[in-house]
């Protein structure tokens, strides 16, 4: 990976951390922006940027609607794992959240696009998703699960459709100095991924160090062998 790019990106984030919070109020809603860099962009156990650093930027809007909270967002980052993608991924998503005591439900839809992809079936991948997070009051932990349903028929490996639905179980724990996360996810016909992370905010920038273990889920997986990664990411919300 290009260490100069990583160091430069982290330095830029530290500079941004000195900026005032730029949250924009729009009626009862709010608009925020984020920027960051991943030392490697790993998505469900698969390297998305050929072992290179992946800078990213995004924007999120949220607004209360009755008893629900509506959110809309867009994100783009460096990506070089889709033929002809041109080094970029652009995602759009929308959903609603609702809390009942310690339980928060999140239902939404995400569209992941690769503008330069050479064939239609890999230009866009869309998914419905549902998430549940349990955060008991005054407790240092949360428990969560998520389920993503493919809405574009996956993509083809030779003549066979692969990459179906995805489900994940996760838990977080607040250790005080750092936050911990453990997750296990299965991407049907692709990967089974275990992630262990610790996170820490330093002068307004959130840093996350992760160990990721990805196993092939069948012979058609685009992961040619089981893989392990250690990644560092930094993200600033402003």
Predicted segments, located by residue:
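Outer-membrane beta-barrel proteins
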Residues: 2-9, 13-238
């Amino acid at each position: 990976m290009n260490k100069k790019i990583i160091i430069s990106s982290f330095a830029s984030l530290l500079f941004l951390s000195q900026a005032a919070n730029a949250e924009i109020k729009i009626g009862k809603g709010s608009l925020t922006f984020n920027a960051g860099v991943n030392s490697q962009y790993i998505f469900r156990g698969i390297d998305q940027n050929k072992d290179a650093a992946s800078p990213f930027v995004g924007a999120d809007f949220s607004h209360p609607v009755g008893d629900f909270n509506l959110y809309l967002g867009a994100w783009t980052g460096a990506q070089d794992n889709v033929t002809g993608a041109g080094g970029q991924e652009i995602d759009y998503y929308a959903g609603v959240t609702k809390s009942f005591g310690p339980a928060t439900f999140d239902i939404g839809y995400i569209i992941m696009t690769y503008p330069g992809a050479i064939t239609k079936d890999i230009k866009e991948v869309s998914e419905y998703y549902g998430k549940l997070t349990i955060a008991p009051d005054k407790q240092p932990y949360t428990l969560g699960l998520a389920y993503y349903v493919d809405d574009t028929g996956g993509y083809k490996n030779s003549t066979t459709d692969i990459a179906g639905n995805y489900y994940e179980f996760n838990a977080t724990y607040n250790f005080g100095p750092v936050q911990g996360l453990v997750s296990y996810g299965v991407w049907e016909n692709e990967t089974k991924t275990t992630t262990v992370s610790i996170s820490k905010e330093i002068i307004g920038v959130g840093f996350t160090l992760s160990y990721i273990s990805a196993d092939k889920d069948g012979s058609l997986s685009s992961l040619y062998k089981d893989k392990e990664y250690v990644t560092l990411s930094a993200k600033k919300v402003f």
